[in-house]
A protein has these predicted regions:
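Alpha-helical transmembrane segments with an aromatic anchor "belt"
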Residues: 60-127
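N-terminal juxtamembrane cytosolic/stromal segments of multi-pass membrane proteins
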Residues: 1-57
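Alpha-helical transmembrane spans of integral membrane proteins, capturing the lipid-embedded, hydrophobic core
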Residues: 34, 38-42, 46, 77-85, ...
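Terminal transmembrane helical module of multi-pass membrane proteins
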Residues: 128-193
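Membrane-cytosol interface at the C-terminal ends of transmembrane alpha helices
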Residues: 18, 84-98, 144-160
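Residue-level signature of transmembrane alpha-helical entry/exit and packing/kink sites
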Residues: 30-37, 68, 72, 76, ...
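Membrane-interface helix-boundary motifs at transmembrane edges
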Residues: 24-31, 101-104, 158-167
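Alpha-helical membrane-inserting segments
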Residues: 44-56, 86-98, 120-129, 178-186, ...
Length: 193
């Protein structure tokens, strides 16, 4: 699996090879494989944050509570996984309503591959973002990689659902709308909006 992930990341980084990665992986996995990749990507992300937290204390001393940090990262990882499936299935539903001809398991698998690649690429930047003098640059790099990730998601949606470019973007916007609505509801329930 490590060799396969390494190949994915190398092709993910090169925008010219990214479409061929989507084409090659399309139809090769389902819910089970996608879930495994999603769990691995959440572990990579949690590990990056776990490593970066003690580094940040060099510049702003706090009491380091590893158990509390692990518990928080576990809860956030679980919430992230649920959100991934809700957004992915919303994109699938919108894409299907717009004439898409794919399966949800293929879409979720491709999104999981793109998510894993994105997490592996951003992990070093997340760790280095704890170093105060360069934190802004590292967070800027993470943001730019996130924007590139939208391109990867676009290719995955377009490839897995056989959609035109505009319909693929519309499907992605439906997923974004769900995120905004959920955050608005959570904000209203917490009295923040």
């Amino acid at each position: 699996m490590i060799g396969k992930a390494k190949d994915w990341v190398i092709r993910y980084i090169d925008y010219k090879k990214l479409p061929s990665l989507v084409g090659q992986e399309s139809g090769k996995g389902g819910y089970k494989e996608g879930l495994i990749l999603l769990i691995v990507s959440q572990l990579v992300n949690a590990l990056a944050f776990f490593v970066s937290f003690p580094l940040s204390m060099v510049f702003t001393p706090l009491q380091f509570e590893p158990v509390q940090l692990l518990l928080s990262l576990s809860v956030l990882s679980f919430i992230g996984m649920v959100a991934f499936y809700v957004i992915g299935l919303t994109i699938f539903l919108a894409g299907t309503l717009l004439g898409g001809k794919g399966t949800p398991d293929n879409l979720l698998y491709l999104l999981s591959v793109m998510n894993l690649c994105s997490r592996i690429v951003t992990a070093p930047f997340v760790i280095l973002s704890a170093v105060e003098p360069i934190s802004f640059l590292m967070l800027l790099a993470v943001s730019l990689i996130g924007l590139y990730g939208l391109y990867a998601v676009y290719l995955a949606v377009r490839g897995s659902l056989s959609l035109s470019p505009l319909r693929a973007i519309a499907s992605m916007l439906a997923g974004l709308l769900v995120v905004i609505l959920v955050l608005a509801v959570l904000g209203l329930s917490a009295g923040q909006v």
